[in-house]
Amino acid sequence: MSRRRKKLPQESITCEIESLSHEGRGVSHKDGKTLFVEGALPGETVTARYVNSRRSYDELAVEEVLTQHPQRIEPDCQFSKLCGGCSMQHVDLGFQINHKESVLLDHLRHFGDLKPEQVVPPLVGAGRGYRTKARLGVRYVAKRDEVLVGFRERYSNFLTAIDECPILIESVGGRIPELKALVRSLSGYQRIPQIEVAAGDDMCALVIRHMDPLTEEDLQKLIAFSEQTGLAIYLQPKGPDTVAKLWPKDGQELLSYQLRDYGLTMQFHPMDFTQVNRDINRRMLAQALEWLQPQAGETILDLFCGLGNFTLPIARSAAHVVGVEGSEDMVRRGYANAELNGISNVEFHAADLHLPLAPAKEAKHAWLRTYDKVLLDPPRSGAEELAKQMTRFGAKRIVYVSCNPATLARDAGILATQGYKLIKAGVMDMFPHTAHVESMALFEKA
């Protein structure tokens, strides 16, 4: 028998906000219970309504700000109070980045008992139109005979009824009503659950997931939309491996972005992982290479290398670079990008980097050898197994690019036991207006 959900208090309460949680929510207390208040800032007095209740804490959302923080601003997006895509549009970018830096340092201190010798200035960029990769939910609402396209509401599985998205690349974020109308015009409009957005430097693609076959009339409508907007249309009838380009019929399935500082063109499929913020990606690369300092005689290991975003820039300076990635498809993409750019001093391998490292003598693990330096860019789960055996590679310098400060701190603590010292750390604002923290850390062998 399922447990009956506790009924939420209906009356709003007044909260004195004491601090900000790592997730960017105001923290208060009432009757010995912690309150997390969405949309509230430290030092503010607000009225808030209950949206969720747990045994040890309650979640609330701001209704009215009675005493305002000096850095509170009017959100740039009219849908910010309802849409769950952003959580910090109510405060200026300076406050956001300072908060993210504090989160990073707190995690390093609490989880790794570490403090970097130097905290470097943050990498920051534009707060609008930065997002080149996103998954938009699609849902038909029968009561209103309307198709919604966008992100989920906060504290809900419903989609937010939006007409624009200022953080998305303009060619898509400014066309939400057109996307709604397009989906509604298709025969299977009730069976289209999502649209993937992926943009290169010169082309933006929409990958439309459709559960039912499309008619010839549907295809013509999609082609007409592509020609009117300049957006490429890809169709996905089943799993990711079924994605195929519908229009334009130019023989080019891949998108691309330029890394001009290194004379590189990086090609990728719309379903490949790429960094969502192209400007911050370029700044991140510059900082990573400055910290890594690849030299002409060195062999360097790039772990979780993806399609070669770090591998190929490093190869412009190093003698040899080895990229390792969990996906065979990404290994093939890495080799293809190397060939496209005339780079021959690289090799790519596929391996599950979350498992304990196998004996180096196994042929399929030929990449398990010594290196001068290591760069790693793991997913949110981090690189615990690699950190435990990092001395095996013999590297004197490690650059760790992180999308989760908690796992970075955990792995940094492990690296410290392996004899590596935390020299520098800093944040990168890859996702403005969210509490998401991207960071970079430099370790050197003590």
From Swiss-Prot:
Enzyme Commission number(s) from the entry: 2.1.1.190
UniProt: S-adenosyl-L-methionine binding residues: 275, 304, 309, 325, 352, 377
Active site feature: 403
Stretches assigned to the TRAM domain: 6-64
Record flagged with keyword Metal-binding: yes
Gene3D superfamilies xrefs: 2.40.50.1070, Nucleic acid-binding proteins, Vaccinia Virus protein VP39
Example of a GO biological process term: rRNA base methylation
Catalytic activity reported: uridine(1939) in 23S rRNA + S-adenosyl-L-methionine = 5-methyluridine(1939) in 23S rRNA + S-adenosyl-L-homocysteine + H(+)
GO molecular function: 4 iron, 4 sulfur cluster binding; iron ion binding; RNA binding; rRNA (uridine-C5-)-methyltransferase activity
Keywords on record: 4Fe-4S, Iron, Iron-sulfur, Metal-binding, Methyltransferase, rRNA processing, S-adenosyl-L-methionine, Transferase
Any Pfam family the entry gives: tRNA_U5-meth_tr
Annotated residues for binding of [4Fe-4S] cluster: 77, 83, 86, 165
NCBIfam families xrefs: PRK13168.1, rumA
HAMAP family membership: 23SrRNA_methyltr_RlmD (MF_01010)
Family: Belongs to the class I-like SAM-binding methyltransferase superfamily. RNA M5U methyltransferase family. RlmD subfamily.
Known function: Catalyzes the formation of 5-methyl-uridine at position 1939 (m5U1939) in 23S rRNA.
Name this protein carries in UniProt: 23S rRNA (uracil(1939)-C(5))-methyltransferase RlmD
Organism of provenance: Hahella chejuensis (strain KCTC 2396)
